Amino acid sequence: DGSKDNTAAEVRKLHEKDERVHLVSFSRNIGKEAGIYAGFQKAKGDYVVMMDADLQDPPSLLPEMFSYIKQGYDSVATRRVTRKGEPPIRSFFARMFYRIMNKISKTEIVDGARDYRLMTRQVVDSILSMCEYNRFTKGIFGWVGYETKWLEYENAVSYTHLTLPTIFRV
């Protein structure tokens, strides 16, 4: 998504080794939600995993996530149990956001929910069929209504640097 690091080159190398790995790259930052939607459009597999590239989400959970899909869940999502390592002001505003959203919305938005999740093709197709222009995926995941298994883990420190403007933009 307009990243200036070496992520795109690394993904291209992975694609050379495994054609199931694909890169969706943009010339500029188009925003998280639009980037997620573009990734869903590109994904063709029976299962789709979504995770941040900054390693805050433990890839080691994938086998466990897949085992729950095999047990019949449509989606396996993750949430952090603490906000350890996060700036206190960001934690405060995040908690307030979830509290307010859950008061005014009929769709539950899980506090601490991460974008890291594994979904069946049916879930992804349902999301893609929505005509929403301004998307909020955490709300959409709840709204489409598929059975979701939640896995919890401790918050990890991001390998990217957060700046004050980034905190306010997020």
Segments from the language model and where they lie:
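Flexible glycine/serine/alanine-rich "lid" or loop that lines and gates the nucleotide-sugar donor pocket
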Residues: 143
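Acceptor/aglycone-binding surface of glycosyltransferases and processive sugar-polymer synthases
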Residues: 13, 20, 24-28, 32-42, ...
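Short, conserved catalytic or interaction motifs in soluble domains
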Residues: 28, 53-55, 153
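Short beta-strand-to-loop acidic/aromatic patch adjacent to the donor-nucleotide binding site
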Residues: 46-54
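A conserved acidic beta->alpha catalytic loop
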Residues: 1-9, 55-56
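Short beta-strand and adjacent tight-turn residues that come in two discontinuous sequence segments
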Residues: 50, 78, 151
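Single conserved hydrophobic/aromatic residue that forms the stacking wall/gate
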Residues: 161-170
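Short, charged cytosolic
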Residues: 146-159
